[in-house]
Amino acid sequence: MTPMLLSAFWTYTLITALTPGPNNILALSAATAHGFRQSIRVLAGMSLGFLVVMLLCAGIAFSLAVIDPAIIHLLSWVGAAYILWLAWKIATSPAADENARPKPVGFWVSFGLQFVNVKIILYGITALSTFVLPQTQALNWVIGVSILLALIGTFGNVCWALAGHLFQRAFRHYGRQLNIILALLLVYCAVRIFY
C-alpha cells in the first residue's frame, strides 16, 4: 500500500470508528448512565460481534475478488461513493442528541446488534474492497486487516465509553463544526483512493 493510500485508510477507519453510530452511542450511553465498569459487558459483546462481522465482510469481499477481480475495481468506486455520501451525511447532520439514553443492555444484545449494524458492515466491506483487495488478495492479509478493523472499531467504542459526558458536552457546543471537519476528512479519503 502506498503511503498516500495508507494515510487515506487510517483516516477513513479512524473517522468511521470515532463518529457517532449505533455502537458509539450505546457505549456512551451505557458508560454515562451506569459507569464504565458496568458497561464492560456491553463493550465486550460489541467487540466480539464486531470481529465476527469483519471476518464475514472479509469472506464476502474476498469471494467477490476471486470470482471476478474486476469487481474490486467497481467496489472501489462504490466505496468512494459511499465515503462521499457518508461525508455529506456527517456535514449536514445536527449535533448528537445528548438526551438519547437507551436502557442498559448486556453482552448478547450488544453482540447481536453488530449483525444489523449497517455502519460497520459498510465500514468492513468498504475498507477491504477499497484499500486492501486492490493491493493484495493474500488471505492472511485480508484476515489480518479484518482483525485490525475490529480492533479500530473497539478502540472507538472504548473512547466513547471513557469520554462519557465529555463527548456529550463537546458535541453540544461544537458538534456542527466537528461534523464539517470530519466530512472534509472523508472527502480527502475518497479522493485518495484514486490519486
Curated annotation (Swiss-Prot):
The keyword Lyase does not apply. It catalyses: O-acetyl-L-serine(in) = O-acetyl-L-serine(out); L-cysteine(in) = L-cysteine(out). Residues 1-9, 68-69, 126-141, 195 are periplasmic. It holds the Pfam family LysE. Residues 33-46, 91-104, 163-176 are cytoplasmic. Keywords: Amino-acid transport, Cell inner membrane, Cell membrane, Membrane, Transmembrane, Transmembrane helix, Transport. It is a multi-pass membrane protein. InterPro entries: LeuE-type. It is found in: Cell inner membrane. The chain crosses the membrane at residues 10-32, 47-67, 70-90, 105-125, 142-162, 177-194. The keyword Protein biosynthesis does not apply. One of its GO terms (cellular component) is plasma membrane. GO terms for molecular function: amino acid transmembrane transporter activity. One of its GO terms (biological process) is cysteine export across plasma membrane. It comes from the Bacteria. Exporter of O-acetylserine (OAS) and cysteine. Belongs to the Rht family. This is Cysteine/O-acetylserine efflux protein.
